[in-house]
Amino acid sequence: MMLEYALVLSAFLFSIGIYGLITSRNMVRALMCLELILNAVNMNLVTFSYFFDNRQLKGDIFSIFIIAIAAAEAAIGLAIVSSIYRNRKSTRIDQSNLLNN
């Protein structure tokens, strides 16, 4: 019975992340929504690993790998956003066309 609750929560987090990513106009908010999506995927991996793969822990190891990649992605993304903010004085996605001067 706990499997259904974990999957519903993960689907809810994933849906919130997708909705926020589609409707977000701020780059920092879009990065946060992307992190929410990755956390929902990690929750699915750990849940399925717990219920269906008790001995090998492949899902747990893979989720730790995803967390490390997500941390690097967040650091690089925030560095890019801060650089864009320093140059353009805005973090709005629709105002930051980097191909124009």
UniProtKB/Swiss-Prot annotation:
Q: Does the keyword Thylakoid feature in the UniProt annotation? A: yes
How is it placed in the membrane, per its record?
Multi-pass membrane protein
Gene Ontology annotations for the cellular component aspect, listed alphabetically: chloroplast thylakoid membrane; NADH dehydrogenase complex
Top EC class for this record: translocase
State the reactions this protein catalyses: a plastoquinone + NADH + (n+1) H(+)(in) = a plastoquinol + NAD(+) + n H(+)(out); a plastoquinone + NADPH + (n+1) H(+)(in) = a plastoquinol + NADP(+) + n H(+)(out)
What are the entry keywords?
Chloroplast, Membrane, NAD, NADP, Plastid, Plastoquinone, Quinone, Thylakoid, Translocase, Transmembrane, Transmembrane helix, Transport
- E.C. number: 7.1.1.-
Name the major location: plastid
Q: Which residues cross the membrane?
A: 2-22, 32-52, 61-81
Entry's localization field: Plastid, Chloroplast thylakoid membrane
Query: What's a Gene Ontology MF term here?
Result: oxidoreductase activity, acting on NAD(P)H, quinone or similar compound as acceptor
Q: Which GO terms describe its biological process?
A: ATP synthesis coupled electron transport; photosynthesis, light reaction
- InterPro entries (alphabetical): NADH_UbQ_OxRdtase_chain4L/K (IPR001133), NUOK/Mnh_C1-like (IPR039428)
Q: Say which family it is in.
A: Belongs to the complex I subunit 4L family.
* Subunit structure, as described in the record: NDH is composed of at least 16 different subunits, 5 of which are encoded in the nucleus.
Described purpose of this protein according to its UniProt entry: NDH shuttles electrons from NAD(P)H:plastoquinone, via FMN and iron-sulfur (Fe-S) centers, to quinones in the photosynthetic chain and possibly in a chloroplast respiratory chain. The immediate electron acceptor for the enzyme in this species is believed to be plastoquinone. Couples the redox reaction to proton translocation, and thus conserves the redox energy in a proton gradient.
Name of the protein? NAD(P)H-quinone oxidoreductase subunit 4L, chloroplastic
In its UniProt entry, the species of origin is given as Ipomoea purpurea (Common morning glory)
- Gene name linked to the record: ndhE
